[in-house]
């Protein structure tokens, strides 16, 4: 490691060099302006001398690298607010031009060139080479025997271009004329960065020999090579003009197509090629009538699978190869990466070092960026393609991954920045490093410095929060589109590398991207959090509160422009905000340790970590199946979903998660937006989901017996249902047959399973006839998982964490197998297997229901199987009935038995059913016992588990787009239902009768406490002294208002009202607060004006609407002739406004005393309650609402001015009683008084 950064820096004084300090000269008379800057500089920028486009682009590097090591001219863009002595009218917008000088950085009173390498640098450096110059200390020659690999690259080298490197002849032969080279990137135990270039790996594919010979008239393998070379030379373009038959090698082997039992072994040509590009062209274009096999397998996968024991993440050892050949060290001037040492070798020079499990001292960078729009509207959402929208700060935290120690804190700032003393003291008190503040005059210099840090320090792992969808795309777009900086040299490769972001689609209105950087593994904690935990909001602050019990000092985005323009002290507040974001993300990273689980999946699947993160579940199973198929003599055919290699292209159809996996609701998926985007759904049998086309019937769900159950409900769960079905019934591509004659020589039932799926008969041979490849994979994985879990109790805490991540990774891959077969456009689809799995699952649910109902219908039958049941009898009649079945869970209602006894006996009952009905390894397990259960609908229930814990599934009691008042009331009602035995008993009695009966009779007396909550809620809603903040609703502005299809949304109404009032409008991704107000004449007039404003905005060009100079007047309505339908006087009745039109900004409503719409809020409360409690009334929402309203008095709500007059006249409001009888007595008394 080559370090170039110091410790705490002295604070800058008046004489210190500061970014933009005296740099800009305000416009004025000749000779006017500030005095000389603190440090002497030349070529001060004048925006009027060199406008954009009049100068040449910055000169690029001339060495064998493409990162910037020299730069003497660049495009200069900086906000005018940094010119703090200029008059206010001159401080809007940005400076934009070209500047002739080296990029500068200022830190702690010092100034230096960004690209200069030397002692005393401002940031740490680990790279040995910079700009073609070796900066290693004298005598630096580390010995490398053992090294850890974390990433694997592949590229194509040409012998002609590598002659000067003085490689050994065997390496030159491997790339003559071209050849694929696998590069292993890693770290030695001593911390030296190493790159091992492995020569001799070749990709290959298969074609049926008989078909090839018939179509191409081939008599020998060489003939096939000649035909392929000729086809390539005749291809469009000049890429393959020099191809000859020597580029290929063909041999004849015996293999079996993996599809169908009746497929017999045959002879195939195995064709080796020297580059993935040639392979891809041949598989796509050479003799399309001939089926290709395994043509989409990249070189990295071949390297791992063709060398038994090799892994994508783990320890390797260099050793002598065949004929005692040794690995060849590369001379520093021949390095292709920013490593400390590089070697050339072949695969036989490598061996796995199995005795080491710890990770070396890899480095983790956690970063966050802050941006600001620079146009006329500084509150607009920044767009990377706009030169005036700038990155103003970047926080960078550098950790040691093995020790979790935070080693460096860096803050890149556009303009001068003074962090608050309180923040520095807080960091010091926590034992964290003092931040190093790096200041810059222009955005280019700051971005170049950041990328230079990325190159020189070279963190192996990078994390942040939503960096894949925002931070990295914004930075890369800035660098490539605005500043024309080549990025292919900023990963571990010095040139011809990959540093790219792909947009791979939308999810819940949220853009989804993937990133690939050579030698840098990006793990976005936003994706990790949304996968691991379910929260109502995934904003970083909400996640920190829920997971870390920590809370950041939030800074509103709309405050950033003002803070930034004020000066260094306020820019320091932004810097503190930026640093604390990175600190929180770092804490989340070490809380979840995602790299351990991801690396375990990568090792198991034989793919690198980047593919594990971004390439879905399909590739994980495919590579494992590919390895096993080769061992068993099978080959896998290419499909439409053939995956690409590490060359960078993303799969055409990225695989989604399994349909039966629960996905957390993402930030921004508000109810109104789901309604807006809603449309007709496709039929159940043919769904397309993020690239998945599923063409078979899904899992069986036994319809729930909705209601409130106060007797114990035992929940049995199938352990690993789908994997166990595949194992038990030997399901696979290779054991399937669609033809009865193919299994005619076998004995039905004994030798094969016959099953009808979707009206078609399918046959699967048993394991003794041919063992399923999928079963072998699952058996080996589960045995490995069991062995790993058994080691955890005896392990050290550190090793236990690693082992737990490994067993979790195996579980994830096992659960991917079923989904792998069921994706029609996947890598190796077999819908018959997937459909058979779900069919057997449905039959198992039905068989379990029939068995339980028949076997334990009477208590005596239960006693016969379980004598201990005699001690668990509870008062009341006995019965056992299944009330719900959902894919892999069965809910059994047990009357007359105690919850404690059922909990103790549940596993025995599950084992009994498993032995009686299912083949191993299928087994039921007792998952939990509910003491009370409100079963609402499929996948929606609330229950209290034996022991007191409440479990809520599919029901949002606390919704992020509901107001606090409704959320609190809903939760209070649920707690009352489950924890008040009087209410629970009354609710159970209520649910046992048809809902219609309660329309004509009083509700049970035990519901009085339940009704009291509703009465109190109604009182608080109608209370003139209510706190309006309790009634604020929110919705996310997921995109620009102009991009919404449905404009009649409450939060859009507020957006346009704010714009009309020339107030600060929310930015995209902000949650817009609003309240629903009463309809008044003033509200009606505002709505009319807003309609005109919406029309103006819809017609306006550009990305952001400009506020109107004056509010548009509503369109004049023509005089109407009074009709018989009009009210007296001829005035037409006002239109009842939509709820979305009644939305108002809470701050405006409070300031102007705007009345709330109490009817709306109570209806909203009743609606929320009905969704949850309709199960008490036969799931009839209309009857539920009608009965709940019984608790509330029918009262007239006069307008506020009328109510004030009534109170002044001595009238008072009389509330309703808690019951209908009490209300009747009060009314009787009132009428007697009036009489």
From Swiss-Prot:
GO terms for molecular function: DNA binding; DNA-directed DNA polymerase activity; nucleotide binding; RNA-DNA hybrid ribonuclease activity. Residues 640-693, 1098-1134 are annotated as: Disordered. Forms a complex with the ssDNA-binding protein UL29, the DNA polymerase processivity factor, and the alkaline exonuclease. Interacts with the putative helicase-primase complex subunit UL8; this interaction may coordinate leading and lagging strand DNA synthesis at the replication fork. Replicates viral genomic DNA. The replication complex is composed of six viral proteins: the DNA polymerase, processivity factor, primase, primase-associated factor, helicase, and ssDNA-binding protein. Additionally, the polymerase contains an intrinsic ribonuclease H (RNase H) activity that specifically degrades RNA/DNA heteroduplexes or duplex DNA substrates in the 5' to 3' direction. Therefore, it can catalyze the excision of the RNA primers that initiate the synthesis of Okazaki fragments at a replication fork during viral DNA replication. This is DNA polymerase catalytic subunit. PROSITE patterns: DNA_POLYMERASE_B. Belongs to the DNA polymerase type-B family. Residues 650-661, 676-691 have a biased composition (Basic and acidic residues). InterPro entries: DNA-dir_DNA_pol_B (IPR006172), DNA-dir_DNA_pol_B_CS (IPR017964), DNA-dir_DNA_pol_B_exonuc (IPR006133), DNA-dir_DNA_pol_B_multi_dom (IPR006134), DNA/RNA_pol_sf (IPR043502), DNA_pol_B_thumb (IPR042087), DNA_pol_palm_dom_sf (IPR023211), DNA_pol_type-B (IPR050240). Disulfide bonds: none annotated. It is found in: Host nucleus. Keywords: DNA replication, DNA-binding, DNA-directed DNA polymerase, Endonuclease, Host nucleus, Hydrolase, Multifunctional enzyme, Nuclease, Nucleotidyltransferase, Transferase, Viral DNA replication. Its EC number is 2.7.7.7, 3.1.26.4. The lineage of its organism: Viruses, Duplodnaviria, Heunggongvirae, Peploviricota, Herviviricetes. It catalyses: DNA(n) + a 2'-deoxyribonucleoside 5'-triphosphate = DNA(n+1) + diphosphate; Endonucleolytic cleavage to 5'-phosphomonoester. It comes from Human herpesvirus 1 (strain KOS). Residues 662-675 have a biased composition (Acidic residues). GO terms for biological process: DNA-templated DNA replication; viral DNA genome replication. It comes from the Viruses. GO terms for cellular component: host cell nucleus. PANTHER family: DNA POLYMERASE CATALYTIC SUBUNIT, DNA POLYMERASE DELTA CATALYTIC SUBUNIT.
